[in-house]
Amino acid sequence: LVDQNTRELVDEDIAWADFVLVSAMVIHREEVARLAERCHEQARPLIGGGPLFHAETDTPLGVDHVVVGEAEEVAADLVADMRRGRVRPRYEATRYPDLGLTPQPRWDLAHLEDYATMSVQSCRGCPFDCEFCDVVVLNGRKPRYKSPDQFVGELETLRDLGWRGPVFVVDDNFVGNRRRCRELLRAVIDWRARTGARMTFL
């Protein structure tokens, strides 16, 4: 796993892989095009996902395969096709996944020392339609939630990996459902009291 915001991608990283996967936002458009050139120079197929490919599904920027939508819905099919060596040009999620079934992020693959904050998420989707925001297009109008236990479990995993810095909650709308927000905050307060964790939340 290479985060090009914090580390340089070297040719050996590409040569090692059977497939190269990139998750990108719209601002990363030029970097993705350069990555595609590097992958093709080493005859490695590039699979793209993330908001960039939702916005530019007709212009894949040299990417060989595109995943549109939230990965939970298509990941199993994509991995099975990769194993068979028959990856389709396009995979598109047709519904929004149940976040209660979402596995924990693999923070153990990241270089935690490279980061000032770590990101966690307890919900996706938003009932509002603000003109400056594309959340409704990307993640839907109906909020979907992780359970308080699931969210606290992710915090516990970060703590077990040695993370003691700030945690950035990257929800689409953290306070949209006030009752659920209070339940989540109570669970976090109880966890902090039980474990002595002193994470700062942003």
PLM regions with names:
Residues 1-100:
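Glycine-rich beta-alpha loop elements in corrinoid/cobalamin-binding modules
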Residues 103-202:
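Radical SAM [4Fe-4S] cluster-binding motif and immediate context
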